[in-house]
């Protein structure tokens, strides 16, 4: 008997007379509790929930603008007492879309509504599955997060996950494979009160983080690990413990002696031709794209792919010439929920521009005073939306400040929020560790001294400001990149110049005991950018080397033509090892993106020693061959690449550090 069940028994014995006392009962039934069925009536007719069919399998898709429609009080299943089980399993069968980097979506949350406190949550990102729960002791309460690295969800296929929790042990099994076990420092609480709490399915009570995939099974099994009940399975990706009645049939295949029926046959309407509008009137109707051989369902206001041929990148064409205020050192593409898609340009001269995607193109939206801006970084803290600019030059008073701006929902503009003293700042990186928010700045130089400290800043929830947290010695720092591997957090810096040579070590740091500690060093040549990316369960780091120079030797033209390097994480050796050298021309940026099932890297080649008119190259992942060049893109002084998606397709945008013109390119697929 678990500690929690014993506690419930003691409380019942203490709270009632011994004579005639009613028998002990657990807080919930010990049978599988179908949480998904709690928000779906038998006929499936719930506002905000739509039944779809993918790969011949039924699932539910949430399109609610008000997440409360897919919620229910915890008291509905916690019938005997108000404590969440100490040992349990959560079983999920789902199909998830590709997510942008650093985006998270919630599968499940349990909230104490009066305090709006997250008691328990399950969310995923492009690389991790996170289990969150509230921990408390005499010192107070805090959020604990247990993260499982790369469950391999981003392949547009069905998967079944089993999360088992017991006595400080957390285990994740994907498609009945080998479990990943984590022994955490903090155990799941034995007395997590759910009094007055509410379950939210597919959200955290907000539209931000709303689950955009398809879900078929969401079950809580109190008291035991569900893995032996589900595995092994003949169809591990659809292993089933309990699903809502409306999803029972795998509609792609009839049972023996049964006529195959189509649940939507009476109402189904299929539109042919070019993309029709998707409005309330077309809800639950289909559109067949004969050219692309794809079948789409109108869900909410978007056409959702139900069946599609594999998407392949055919070629790249120019979509827009974006005239900028001046030369552009960096571009940041981001979206604001309910407002739209934006691109912030870091312009060399006194004003930088923010553009909004309107009618298929970027148009000027807001101008902000900057001082030789190098880059922008978009990030969020709760409901707050921020943009931080890295200023390379001083202001009119000779002071060096980089600035954080905050989005005003009332003014629909970014307004000044906080100034931070920096030294020829090149880059900001925003990240979260253990529920705390951080910013790190790449300080390039102070006067002629390139060997200075860059600074990590921590968000203070009380003052609502960023405060200096840790200094890290850098040499001409140009870029920071944050990433996680399993429960570990990493930060890598691109060091460019130490005052005499560009042949310097760039360093990778790991978060340990509340600070970043040196983990690994790489010999780099004027490193200007790091890009981390995942292909399946493999993790890569690509460095952009820009220049091989030493004051002791005469610089030659070919010192700009050198190899940039891709490293791969060797899990066994616990280190990154060289995977591939790629010839580049003063490379300043890497950008990773995917089209369908294919993966690509595009490099910003800026200078070959003679001219800034050089080709930037798109490389395609070809497995054993590594990355192979597939497209040559004419660019002029190329500085930065960003990939982004809209309902109309996929795009790349690059900035030029040598002319006031950036270009938007459309990825044509077939």
Swiss-Prot record:
GO terms for cellular component: cell surface; ciliary membrane; extracellular region; stereocilium. Residues 59-278 form the Laminin G-like domain. One of its GO terms (biological process) is Notch signaling pathway. SUPFAM superfamilies: Concanavalin A-like lectins/glucanases. Pfam families: EPTP (PF03736). It is found in: Secreted; Cell surface; Cell projection, Stereocilium. InterPro entries: ConA-like_dom_sf, EAR, EPTP, TSPN-like_N. Its main location: secreted. SMART domains: TSPN (SM00210). EAR repeats lie at residues 314-359, 361-409, 413-461, 465-513, 515-571, 575-623, 626-669. Glycans are attached at residue 498. Coiled coil: none annotated. Plays a critical role in tooth and hair follicle morphogenesis through regulation of the Notch signaling pathway. May play a role in development or function of the auditory system. This is Thrombospondin-type laminin G domain and EAR repeat-containing protein. The lineage of its organism: Eukaryota, Metazoa, Chordata, Craniata, Vertebrata.
């Amino acid at each position: 008997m678990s500690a929690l069940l014993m506690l419930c028994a003691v409380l019942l014995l203490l709270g009632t007379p011994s004579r005639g006392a009613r028998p002990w009962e657990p807080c919930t039934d010990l049978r599988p509790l179908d949480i998904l069925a709690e928000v779906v009536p038998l006929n499936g007719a719930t506002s905000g929930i739509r039944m779809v069919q993918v790969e011949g399998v039924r699932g539910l898709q949430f399109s609610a603008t008000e997440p409360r429609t897919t919620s229910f009080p915890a008291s509905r299943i916690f019938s005997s007492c108000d404590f969440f089980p100490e040992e349990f399993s959560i079983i999920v069968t789902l199909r998830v879309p590709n997510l942008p980097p650093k985006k998270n979506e919630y599968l499940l949350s349990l909230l104490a509504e009066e305090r709006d406190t997250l008691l328990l949550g399950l969310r995923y990102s492009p690389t991790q599955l996170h289990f969150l729960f509230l921990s408390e002791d005499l010192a107070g309460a805090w959020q604990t997060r247990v993260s499982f690295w790369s469950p391999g969800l981003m392949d547009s296929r069905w998967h079944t996950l089993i999360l088992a929790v017991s006595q400080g042990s957390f285990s994740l099994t994907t498609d009945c494979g080998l479990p990943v076990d984590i022994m955490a420092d903090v155990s799941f609480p034995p007395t997590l009160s759910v009094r007055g709490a509410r379950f939210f399915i597919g959200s955290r009570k907000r539209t931000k983080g709303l689950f955009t995939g398809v879900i078929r099974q969401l079950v809580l099994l109190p008291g035991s690990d569900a893995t032996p009940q589900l595995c092994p399975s003949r169809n591990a990706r659809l292993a089933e413990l309990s699903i809502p009645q409306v999803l029972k049939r795998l509609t792609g295949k009839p049972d023996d002696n049964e006529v195959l029926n189509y649940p939507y046959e009476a109402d189904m309407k299929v539109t042919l031709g070019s993309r029709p509008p998707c409005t309330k009137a077309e809800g639950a109707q289909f559109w067949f794209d004969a050219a692309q051989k794809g079948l789409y369902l109108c869900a909410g206001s978007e056409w959702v792919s139900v069946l599609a041929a594999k998407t392949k990148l055919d070629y790249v064409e120019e979509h827009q010439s974006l005239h900028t205020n001046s030369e552009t050192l960096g571009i940041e593409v981001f979206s604001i929920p309910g407002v739209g898609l934006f691109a912030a340009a870091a312009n060399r001269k006194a004003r930088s521009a923010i553009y909004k995607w309107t009618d298929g193109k970027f148009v000027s939206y807001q101008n902000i005073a900057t001082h030789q801006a190098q880059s922008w970084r978009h990030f969020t803290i709760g409901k707050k939306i921020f943009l931080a600019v890295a200023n390379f030059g001083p202001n009119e008073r000779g002071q060096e400040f980089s600035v954080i701006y905050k989005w005003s929902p009332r003014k629909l503009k970014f307004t000044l929020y906080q100034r931070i003293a920096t030294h020829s700042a090149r880059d900001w990186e925003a990240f979260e560790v253990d529920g705390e928010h951080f910013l790190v700045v790449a300080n390039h130089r102070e006067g002629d001294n390139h060997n200075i400290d860059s600074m990590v800043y921590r968000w203070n929830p009380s003052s609502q400001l960023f405060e200096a947290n840790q200094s890290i010695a850098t040499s001409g720092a140009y870029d920071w990149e944050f990433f996680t591997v399993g429960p570990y957090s990493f930060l890598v810096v691109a060091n460019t110049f130490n005052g005499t040579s560009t042949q310097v070590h760039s360093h990778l740091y790991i978060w340990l005991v509340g600070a970043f500690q040196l983990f690994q060093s790489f010999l780099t040549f004027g490193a200007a950018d790091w890009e981390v990316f995942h292909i399946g369960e493999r993790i890569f780091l690509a460095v952009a080397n820009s220049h091989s120079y030493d004051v002791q030797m005469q610089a030659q033209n070919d010192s700009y033509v050198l190899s940039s390097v891709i490293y791969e994480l060797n899990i066994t050796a616990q280190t990154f090892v060289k995977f591939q050298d790629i010839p580049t021309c003063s490379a300043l940026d890497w950008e990773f993106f995917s089209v369908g099932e294919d993966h690509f890297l595009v490099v910003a080649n800026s200078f070959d020693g003679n001219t800034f008119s050089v080709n930037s190259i798109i490389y395609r992942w070809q497995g054993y061959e590594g990355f192979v060049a597939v497209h040559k893109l004419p660019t002029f002084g190329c500085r930065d690449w960003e990939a982004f998606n809209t309902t109309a397709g996929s795009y790349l945008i690059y900035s030029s550090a040598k002319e006031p013109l950036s270009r938007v390119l459309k990825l044509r697929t077939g």
